[in-house]
From Swiss-Prot:
Substrate binds at H125, R155, D156, R187, R193, R263, A264, D265, R266, K336. The lineage of its organism: Bacteria, Pseudomonadati, Pseudomonadota, Gammaproteobacteria, Alteromonadales. The gene is gpmI. Pathway: Carbohydrate degradation; glycolysis; pyruvate from D-glyceraldehyde 3-phosphate: step 3/5. Mn(2+) 1 binds at D403, H407, H463. It comes from Shewanella denitrificans (strain OS217 / ATCC BAA-1090 / DSM 15013). Its cofactor is Mn(2+). It catalyses: (2R)-2-phosphoglycerate = (2R)-3-phosphoglycerate. This is 2,3-bisphosphoglycerate-independent phosphoglycerate mutase. One of its GO terms (cellular component) is cytosol. Monomer. It is an enzyme of class 5 (isomerase).
Amino acid sequence: MTTAKRPLALLILDGWGYRENPHNNAIFHARTPVLDKLNAQFPNSLISGSGLDVGLPDGQMGNSEVGHINIGSGRVVYQELTRVSKAIEEGEFEENTVLCKTIDDAIKANGAVHIMGLLSPGGVHSHEEHIEAMCRMAVKRGAKQVYLHAFLDGRDTPPRSAKGSLAHFGDLFTTLGQGRIASVIGRYYAMDRDNRWDRVSQAYELITQGKGKFSYSNAVDALEAAYSRDENDEFVAASSITDAQGQTASLNDGDSLIFMNFRADRARQITRSVINADFDGFERAVTPKINFVTLTEYAADISAPKAFSSSDLVNTLGETLQNLGKTQLRISETEKYAHVTFFFNGGKEDPFKGEDRIMIPSPKVATYDLQPEMNSTELTDKLVEAIESAKYDVVICNYPNGDMVGHTGNFDAAVKACEAVDACIGRVVAALAKVNGECLITADHGNAEQMTDESTGQAHTAHTSELVPFIYVGRDASIKDGGRLSDIAPTMLSLMGQPVPAEMTGRCIIDLKE
């Protein structure tokens, strides 16, 4: 006979930060009676999810990948942004054997070096300083054909902020005497992660064949034309940039292609379309034989050389629960499924023993402000069912709404998103009460609490560095000050009466009262 579990649930409200200023604060203006009541009745605090507290540079806003790695590992994990930047500063980047080889291979084959990535100072998926270092390195090693395929941001940066980056790289190539920007496209197309292959196919054609919806002789002109079409950076249509002779750049046999994004989730689809022989997401007109390199590891099943190998995280929360013989459930919508699985498990793709996973498809809408509740009702239906089954010791759920709708910059939609999540939390807490379970409610980073950029007046679509909530719905207790995301896993194990592995350098921040 199976013993009924008393589950401990962790609810991660993605993009849900705390900001005292009510101005353009969707969370403040949302009607959230459930969270208001929980904050009034149960121990709660604010914890850090950004900067040095999550292994990022001081002041750098947090993000979903970083947040989930820190939560799941129970330690501060120094992130790829910091790691690559340090390698550049100390001269190790130019000596990276994987990068050197792929440049040299292209030169020997009389081929071109293509560099693609999110051209942005946002620091969430990439950093333009890394891309600049790569361009300089390619020219320094003797590449005569260097092409930059620029994915534009407008999501982790202001919606119309790419002009400075494009102008800078135009000047950079002039100074270097080699290379140019070969294409421009919004991340909406090139960095999809929801199997919208019709989007990715446009980026693929642009990079491999130089075929875009539009063609210009200058990248800044391409951007300004996009703005005149009312396309913000994120949504800039595929635009090829021609050389002085009016020629576009294409990806040919013998060329090298270096992907400079360090974050995996939005890099996987375009990568698979380029390198997988059995790819069937869309019809590929050409499949050139190239040297393809990723900056970091994107997935275990992506067989491409990587410039920076992942550090192995052992005794994460998932692995520890496995070793204790505990059962666990990971559940979210498509948009955040990788975060509660791959990233939460420290970059491990396969589930641990006793770990079940449920993915609820995110709604097929162009942007999530069109359906701010997303599929939170269906997600909660499955979550409540799992809790009431008394099958799991630990349940980990991510509600994507605050982040995904916050990124649209639509204030009214973000308010509705927060209200939808609040209603779902009420159902989850009620289900836990039926089985004598407990709950921790937190967030991975901020977003929806600031919907307008105070300095520019533009929509604020990026994350923030605000503190995030931490609520314990359970026994009589108090919460210590100064918590951070890496304290959550040790706290969960302590609440379960289990030892905390030595590798978890976070601390338990809940003191249970006798």
